[in-house]
From Swiss-Prot:
GO BP terms in the entry: translation
Protein source organism: Maricaulis maris (strain MCS10)
Keyword Ribosomal protein tagged: yes
Protein name: Large ribosomal subunit protein bL19
Function recorded in the entry: This protein is located at the 30S-50S ribosomal subunit interface and may play a role in the structure and function of the aminoacyl-tRNA binding site.
Record's keyword annotation contains Ribonucleoprotein: yes
Length: 132
């Protein structure tokens, strides 16, 4: 392991603290709890939608979540190691064959649905990929 990878691992551990990041991919329906500061007040806002992409790697990794709000498509890009993201919940696993689901931007209604990946035991537990 080179020096940069080691520094990135240490920084990721420092930023995460007690939080854990679930293993999710494109097609999964997520609930992202985001900390929002409005003046003196601070609150948690939940953004629920389909993960349509994961980008980057290391500390710079991010993911895009899309939802339909009042008939309009809304997308937010969250850094994976953001201190403003309080928690990430996986609501359901999606069965898709693509890593990037940008084609969902052009779809509405039933054609934008994603089938659920079923294992027979609820949300499937995957081991994180090992590099090397």
């Amino acid at each position: 392991m080179n020096m940069i990878e080691q520094l990135e691992q240490e920084e990721a551990a420092r930023v995460l603290g007690e939080k854990t990041i679930p293993d999710f991919s494109a097609g999964d329906t997520l609930r992202v709890h985001v900390r929002i500061k409005e003046g003196e007040r601070e609150r948690i806002q939940v953004f629920e939608g389909v993960c349509i992409a994961r980008n980057g790697g290391g500390l710079n990794e991010s993911y895009t979540v899309r939802k339909i709000s009042f008939g309009e498509g809304v997308e937010r890009v969250f850094p994976l190691y953001s201190p403003n993201v309080e928690q990430i919940e996986i609501k359901r696993k999606g069965k898709v064959r693509r890593a990037k689901l940008y084609y969902l931007r052009d779809r509405r209604g039933k054609s934008a649905r994603i089938a659920e990946r079923v294992t027979g035991r609820g949300i499937e537990k995957r081991e994180p990929k090992k590099k090397g």
